C-alpha cells in the first residue's frame, strides 16, 4: 500500500511530482499494490488554531478556496479497511473529506467554539510565507505552506468524491470535531 496525494497526476502542489514518480515505479515493478491518494489532513490547519487564538486571527493565502480535508483517523481507518479486505486491494482511491471548507469557514468554526471573533485574514502568498518565517518556521517550510494555500485558492485541495466515507462506512469526521480537539 502506498499513500499518495489527492489527484496526484494532475496536482500542481510542489510535492505531487514525487508521488507521481513513486506511483509510476510501483506500476512498472509488477508488484501488486494499492494507492490511497489522500487529500489534505484537517490537522494541517488545526495545529495552527492555538496560535490563531493567541494572535486573534487565522492567517493564510487560500482566498476562498475550498479544502476537502479529512481527519488523520479517517485516512487511517481507510488504510486499515483496505488492508483487511483483499477485494479492495489493487486499486487507486481518491480520498477526501465529505465536508469542504474555506479558511474563513474554519475561522468561523473556531470563533463559534471559543465564543469570540477570530477572523480569517487572507494575504498574498509571499506575505504569508514571510509571516510564517517571522513566527519561527524555516523559510523552506514557510514557503511550502504558503504555496499549498495559494494552490488551495485555485481548487487543488477540493474534491467532491466520497470514496473515503464509503471505505470507512461512515461520514468523515466533521470540521467542528477536529477544531474542538485542537483547542481542547
Language-model segments: which ranges?
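Catalytic nucleophile serine of serine hydrolases
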Residues: 4-5, 171
Amino acid at each position: 500500500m502506498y499513500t499518495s496525494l489527492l489527484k496526484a497526476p494532475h496536482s500542481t502542489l510542489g510535492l505531487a511530482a514525487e508521488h507521481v514518480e513513486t506511483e509510476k515505479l510501483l506500476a512498472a515493478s509488477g508488484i501488486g499494490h494499492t494507492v490511497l491518494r489522500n487529500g489534505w489532513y484537517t490537522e494541517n490547519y488545526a495545529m495552527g488554531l492555538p496560535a490563531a487564538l493567541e494572535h486573534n486571527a487565522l492567517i493564510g493565502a487560500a482566498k476562498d478556496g475550498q479544502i476537502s480535508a479529512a481527519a488523520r483517523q479517517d485516512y487511517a481507518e481507510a488504510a486499515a479497511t483496505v488492508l483487511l479486505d483483499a477485494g479492495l486491494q489493487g486499486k487507486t482511491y481518491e480520498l477526501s473529506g465529505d465536508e469542504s471548507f474555506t479558511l474563513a469557514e474554519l475561522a468561523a468554526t473556531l470563533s463559534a467554539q471559543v465564543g469570540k471573533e477570530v477572523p480569517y485574514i487572507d494575504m498574498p502568498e509571499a506575505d504569508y510565507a514571510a509571516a510564517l518565517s517571522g513566527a519561527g518556521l524555516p523559510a523552506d517550510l514557510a514557503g511550502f505552506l504558503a504555496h499549498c494555500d495559494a494552490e488551495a485558492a485555485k481548487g487543488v485541495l477540493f474534491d467532491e468524491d466520497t470514496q473515503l466515507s464509503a471505505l470507512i462506512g461512515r461520514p468523515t469526521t466533521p470540521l467542528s470535531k477536529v477544531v474542538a480537539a485542537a483547542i481542547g
